[in-house]
């Protein structure tokens, strides 16, 4: 390939550019003296030159050199689509930059208009003020490069001058002005290798400038070919060559959006990020999520679950899916893209009192002050069964699999088959109202570093206003019914084959109980808490400290602690390995009726209209959720949320921030109870003179 060039001028050297010479009346800042022998020969001698656009004989665009009568432009007459950079402005970073040439520091200035077309440009290389004169008493020359590839060395700067304006005063008498003919009319072939050599000899900044000017004369097809070749070479894979541990450290600092964006960079990155499943485990913990029974079954379908579940008990490989499930569940509740659906239906409740509410699978179970137990379908609202047998109000109810156990003001405990809607067993023995119930089933736990299972069989424990607790065996589904006639003979009911023993010790009504495995915690109006081993009836601890009645207790088996809330407005955390009080939590202004624990947080509800969240490890308060007025009648919580009822409304809170997200229900006369599962919230409420069950479905479909 050969190109044409202009012959070299004897009086001045040339460099390839397409820029007019800068003519400025302002002298340059004096630098160090200039020695032509140390300046690059490629800039002083014109033996290797880049061609101008109008010198490329082989370009078919040169057939027409006029556009709308303008014959002075060196750019061929073409449309802007074919030549995308034809009218593009020179980027600012190409117009002003610094260069170091042969130990001389130069500031390169382009003084042509930013929107100049190719062929209309000029450059000056101005020596910098802070250059030390080391080579000569004379300062370095200002180098001016014009559009016809000529270089002008200006020696008009005095090194003794004290005033150094920013740009040079250039004598244009020895230069060729824009638009004039080359010095010689003789043309000779210019070898492509010499063009490349000249380009390589240019300073980096001028290379970039010159290359952009060439691109302005390239058509779209040529630019596309260049892009296709260059783009892959300019990309550098910053992950593939790094050690696994460093990549992991980088990824753990990304948010989810950035992490997912990285997966789209390339198939290689996608494969790398697929391997780093520990990222999802890290995010799982960062979001405050906790694995549950379903997660364990998903990851270990053939293994028995450990006594207590922790995030590190499941392999990292399963966490992408586990995180997704928890994250979407949180989003459905806290930030739903589809508004939750709402099903409301009235229920018949004499005296308008719903004493308890349970959401069990697709069934809603309610008990009332009339003694009836109703089972409604949670999807349709249809009444599926009405369990009748208690003579007075039912104040306590528990469920285990297909068995429902109820305790009543009529002093009896009844056992029901849910599917058959039938009472199978009646237990008598208490001489006053049954106020609380618990079902304890064989559970795996760690004691003294050894994994054990206790108790050896399921038990029912009932607490009564007669100051006692009674322990019964939980009947099996295959056991025959036990339905003795009513009698006033207490001795006869002591012979009940399901009766185990009576727990005696409290001196006032047993108000609340909580248990796990073989351990039961009871709270009484006698202001004390007792810890029992259910299978033997032994009282392990008698905990004193509260000054008034106990309204709520909670047993936390993993930490081996229990928590009590009292009418004295305080909460106490007890260490059951020593029987001592660890913390006294104060802040509520009324009696504490509700307690719940999740992970390291204790949540308490009080008649002072507030919900408080505490750090269970330190006993320090974390936040207060104010609820206007009215005592907190009910609340439920999990790793994402708190749902509370008071002040005529049901509210949804973010458990991590304490922020009130929305009102689920408003304009209520009374809220008795709330409950929820993975997809639904159910509330038993009263509007005016009618009781209702409200089902709010967050699954994105009609309940």
From Swiss-Prot:
Localization, UniProt: Cytoplasm; Nucleus
GO molecular function, one term: ubiquitin-like ligase-substrate adaptor activity
Major location category of this protein: cytoplasm
Residue ranges annotated for the F-box domain, each copy included: 236-283
Its job: Involved in maintenance of ploidy through proteasome dependent degradation of CDK inhibitor rum1 and S-phase initiator cdc18. Functions as a recognition factor for rum1 and cdc18, which are subsequently ubiquitinated and targeted to the 26S proteasome for degradation. Together with pop1, required for cig2 instability during G2 and M phase and cig2 degradation in exponentially growing cells.
Ranges: WD repeats: 389-417, 429-473, 505-533, 545-575, 587-615, 625-654
Gene3D superfamilies membership: 1.20.1280.50, YVTN repeat-like/Quinoprotein amine dehydrogenase (2.130.10.10)
Protein name: WD repeat-containing protein pop2
Segments of this protein annotated with the region Interaction with pop1: 1-170
Region (Disordered): 1-73, 156-180
GO cellular component: cytoplasm; nuclear SCF ubiquitin ligase complex; SCF ubiquitin ligase complex
GO biological process: negative regulation of mitotic DNA replication initiation; protein polyubiquitination; SCF-dependent proteasomal ubiquitin-dependent protein catabolic process
SMART domains: FBOX (SM00256), WD40 (SM00320)
Recorded superkingdom: Eukaryota
């Amino acid at each position: 390939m050969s190109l044409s060039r202009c012959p070299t001028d004897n009086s001045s050297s040339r460099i390839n550019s397409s820029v007019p010479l800068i003519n400025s009346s302002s002298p340059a800042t004096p630098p160090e003296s200039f020695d032509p022998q140390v300046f690059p020969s490629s800039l002083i001698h014109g033996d290797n030159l880049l061609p101008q656009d109008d010198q490329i004989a082989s370009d078919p665009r040169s057939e027409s050199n006029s556009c709308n009568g303008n014959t002075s432009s060196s750019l061929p007459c073409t449309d802007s689509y074919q030549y995308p950079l034809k009218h593009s402005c020179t980027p600012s970073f190409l117009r002003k930059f610094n260069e170091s040439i042969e130990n001389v520091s130069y500031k390169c200035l382009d003084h042509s208009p930013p929107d100049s077309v190719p062929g209309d440009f000029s450059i000056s290389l101005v020596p910098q003020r802070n250059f030390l004169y080391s080579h000569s008493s004379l300062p370095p020359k200002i180098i001016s490069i014009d559009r016809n590839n000529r270089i002008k060395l200006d020696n008009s700067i005095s090194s003794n001058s004290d005033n150094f304006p920013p740009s040079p005063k250039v004598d244009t008498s020895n230069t060729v002005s824009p638009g004039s003919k080359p010095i010689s009319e003789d043309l000779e072939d210019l070898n492509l290798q010499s063009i490349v050599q000249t380009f390589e000899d240019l300073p980096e900044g001028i290379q970039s400038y010159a290359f952009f000017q060439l691109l302005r004369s390239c058509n779209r097809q040529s630019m596309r070919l260049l892009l296709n070749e260059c783009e892959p070479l300019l990309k550098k894979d910053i992950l593939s060559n790094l050690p696994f541990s460093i990549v992991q450290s980088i990824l753990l600092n990304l948010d989810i959006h950035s992490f997912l964006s990285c997966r789209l960079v390339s198939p290689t990155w996608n494969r790398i990020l697929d391997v780093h499943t520990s990222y999802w485990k890290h995010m799982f913990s960062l979001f405050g999520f906790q694995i549950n029974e379903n997660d364990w079954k998903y990851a270990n379908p053939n293994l028995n679950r450990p006594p207590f579940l922790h995030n590190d008990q499941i392999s990292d490989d399963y966490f992408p899916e586990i995180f997704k499930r928890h994250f979407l569940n949180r989003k459905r509740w806290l930030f739903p893209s589809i508004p939750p659906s709402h099903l409301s239906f009235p229920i018949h409740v004499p005296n308008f009192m719903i004493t308890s509410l349970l959401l069990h699978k697709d069934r809603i179970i309610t008990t009332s002050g009339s003694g009836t137990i109703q089972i409604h379908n949670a999807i349709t609202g249809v009444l599926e069964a009405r369990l009748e047998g208690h003579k007075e109000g039912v104040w306590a109810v528990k469920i285990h699999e297909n068995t429902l156990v109820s305790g009543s003001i009529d002093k009896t405990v009844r056992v029901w088959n849910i599917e058959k809607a039938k009472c199978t067993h009646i237990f008598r023995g208490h001489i006053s109202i049954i106020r609380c119930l618990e079902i304890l089933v064989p559970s795996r736990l760690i004691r003294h570093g050894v994994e054990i299972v206790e108790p050896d069989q399921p038990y029912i424990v009932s607490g009564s206003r007669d100051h006692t607790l009674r322990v019964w065996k939980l009947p099996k589904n295959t056991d025959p019914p036990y339905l003795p006639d009513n009698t006033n003979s207490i001795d006869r009911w002591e012979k009940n084959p399901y009766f185990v023993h009576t727990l005696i010790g409290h001196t006032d009504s047993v108000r609340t109980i909580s248990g796990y495995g073989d351990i039961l915690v009871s709270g009484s109006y006698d202001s004390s808490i007792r810890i029992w081993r259910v299978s033997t009836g032994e009282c392990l601890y008698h905990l004193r400290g509260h000054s008034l009645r106990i309204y709520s207790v909670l047993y936390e088996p993993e930490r081996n602690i229990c928590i009590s809330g009292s009418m004295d407005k305080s909460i106490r955390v007890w260490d059951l390995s020593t029987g001592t009080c660890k913390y006294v939590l104060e802040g509520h202004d009324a009696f504490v009726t509700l307690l719940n624990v999740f992970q390291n947080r204790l949540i308490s509800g009080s008649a002072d209209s507030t919900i408080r969240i505490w750090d269970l490890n330190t006993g320090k308060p974390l936040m207060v959720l104010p609820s206007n007025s009215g005592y907190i009648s009910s609340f439920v919580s999990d790793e994402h949320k708190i749902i509370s009822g008071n002040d005529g409304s049901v509210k949804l809170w973010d458990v991590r921030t304490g922020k009130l997200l929305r009102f689920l229900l408003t304009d209520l006369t009374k809220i008795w109870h709330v409950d929820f599962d993975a997809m639904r919230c159910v509330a038993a409420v009263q509007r005016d003179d009618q009781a209702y069950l409200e089902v709010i479905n967050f699954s994105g479909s009609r309940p």
